[in-house]
């Protein structure tokens, strides 16, 4: 192994300085080829703790190696004990994968976890909390990587996104601000966006480009307790658009995959679909039906169209269409499915408390939900929304958030890294043809709750 000149010199000095007052200092100095000034006070001060620091680094690396060796041994044992039945289950079609047991239960937050977000490339997972912090985890290893501080009140939402060259983490807070953090620079706060008049409850990067060019651009949307949605340019930090229509707190916002539409919902018990593709952001549609505050909303992926279209008795819309179907979850304990005409296609009943978050399965067949009843439920859209799986007591207290790790979009020229992820657990062709990309699905989801725990479900 090659050692650089200055590294070698620092090692020699680290050994030599503690002996500088002994009778061997002259001989040692001659042996190492050091002059008189090498043992000066300045040099001693500079190098006196160097050896200790080097050994500390070595100990940390050794611990990391031992952890990896332990994990490797466990995986080898698991592989050796796999039966044909277990092997077939492990390599099941990602389109039918549903969460089972928890891989990692992560703890470090000191208060309720409000939101989580997966990094689009690495195995990093961000979580935010009422404790005013953001924490970055390695979900593969189940380790805390760092704690990010900057907000002065509860952090309510986080999201990864941005252009290919510079993926960012966005966060929003009860301190009325939105902050942008650079993962490539140790999550340094590079910009703070101000403009909302009350707590900012949700933030999402807006994908840019037409169907088949699924790249996240420079736009970010935020939803606030002041009743507005704001669209920001993350490069300049300017608010480029303010959307008004809601009459109370806007709890959630979801952009369409092509960036042309926004779906929002909130305390006024309405769900609103916005067309933001033109110079004027038209309020396209208002959906009414819930009997209490709407906590969450989600736009269905194209893979779900065939199942949801069957509920209308019509043919599935083309892959190029966006915002054709959607789902909302409410404090009235129900989930509602809607089409782009504002018609309620069905109401999913089963939760015993507020529905707090929704996520469509990338394979299209299922809708996942979490609730204050401490359960995670899986609804089969091919069976009209029947609940086919319930994970009871997934958390010890209310479950507040749910995220599915974003998948890999293939065959897309110039695709953004926002849509390019790390290793997947299977390949799934969603049925998109022509220039529209195939998708590799990562069978990984995460949930967070009032119990301050982050649960990672993965195969």
Swiss-Prot record:
WD repeats: from-to residues: 108-149, 151-191, 195-244, 246-284, 306-348, 350-389, 394-438, 440-459
Predominant subcellular localization, coarse grouping: cytoplasm
Cell compartments where the protein resides: Cytoplasm, Cytoskeleton; Cytoplasm, Cytoskeleton, Spindle pole
Keyword terms of this UniProt record: Cell cycle, Cell division, Coiled coil, Cytoplasm, Cytoskeleton, Microtubule, Mitosis, Repeat, Transport, WD repeat
Domain of life: Eukaryota
SUPFAM superfamilies according to UniProt: Lissencephaly-1 protein (Lis-1, PAF-AH alpha) N-terminal domain, WD40 repeat-like
InterPro entries reported for this sequence: Dynein_regulator_LIS1, G-protein_beta_WD-40_rep, LIS1_N, WD40/YVTN_repeat-like_dom_sf, WD40_repeat_CS, WD40_repeat_dom_sf, WD40_rpt
Residues forming coiled coils: 56-83
Gene Ontology MF term list: dynein complex binding
The UniProt record lists the keyword Cell division: yes
GO biological process: cell division; establishment of mitotic spindle orientation; microtubule sliding
Function description: Positively regulates the activity of the minus-end directed microtubule motor protein dynein. May enhance dynein-mediated microtubule sliding by targeting dynein to the microtubule plus end. Required for nuclear migration during vegetative growth as well as development. Required for retrograde early endosome (EE) transport from the hyphal tip. Required for localization of dynein to the mitotic spindle poles. Recruits additional proteins to the dynein complex at SPBs.
PANTHER family: WD REPEAT DOMAIN 5B, WD40 REPEAT PROTEIN
Family to which the UniProt record says this protein belongs: Belongs to the WD repeat LIS1/nudF family.
Protein name, as recorded: Nuclear distribution protein PAC1-2
Species per Swiss-Prot/TrEMBL record: Uncinocarpus reesii (strain UAMH 1704)
Lineage: Eukaryota, Fungi, Dikarya, Ascomycota, Pezizomycotina
